[in-house]
Amino acid sequence: MTGHAKTSAVDIDVDMLMRLRLLCANNYLKRAGAALPTASLFSRKRGRGIEPHDVRPWLDGDDVRTLDHNVTARTGTPHVRNFHEENSHNTLYFIDLRPSMYFGTRRTFRAVAAIEAIIIAAWRTLDFNGSVGIVIATSQETRLIGWAHSRRSFSAMLHEIVAIYREGKNKFDAVDPYLCQSLTLIEKLGGSAPIIIATGFDQPGDNFDMFVKRIAKRREITFILISDPFERAPPSGNYPYHTPDGLAGQIFIKREENNKKNDIFSMRLRQIG
């Protein structure tokens, strides 16, 4: 016995999410420098930045190169102007934790896979000095967990993410809200920040295409499709089913008729543009 409780395959904890940062820390892209996460060229930061930060009177020990000649001439006393690099690498992340995401036949639930994908991406953004916003959709509501501007503040948010996941895991709601309804909140958040959505694409809703088109006109939007191997390639055989509206029965699936959910999802997004 080691004294450490092992997290089950269908559960998560804060320590597990913290360890995901190691995947980013070991990434060679981080060593290449702190450039934009989506850039193809990387370079280390140099200089003092170009965004004005403040203007103040000269103090002993200040670098003479920071003198602001205009303010000095206008006031008659030496003044220095400080600069910094604008931190505008903000990303808004959406985690689909509706009831259908609590399903899985290999390794873990789709909900856990969605959380893992978003947390890894969020750690990467923070390592590049960006800010991350986390929005979570459940059967009851869609809400903004908050914005994190540092690794410390993001670590505090992980506790709430774990609590929301566990609450949903212990509920047995049968009906998913439409995805387009759950996504409505993100249109009002984050200004022009890119949006990354981890979802199983269940119950998208009739207005989903229109919503995505509207968002894509103003900001970058990326989908991470979370699917289970059983969805992509179920073994041939008879399968019982029971729908939320009370229908039940059996269906026979042939191997060549396997659900190609990834292809359907990709094709639909391409048609949206």
What are these regions (language model features)?
Residues 2-41, 57-62, 71, 80-85, ...:
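Exposed, interaction-prone extracellular/peripheral surfaces
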Residues 64-66:
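N-terminal juxtadomain amphipathic helix
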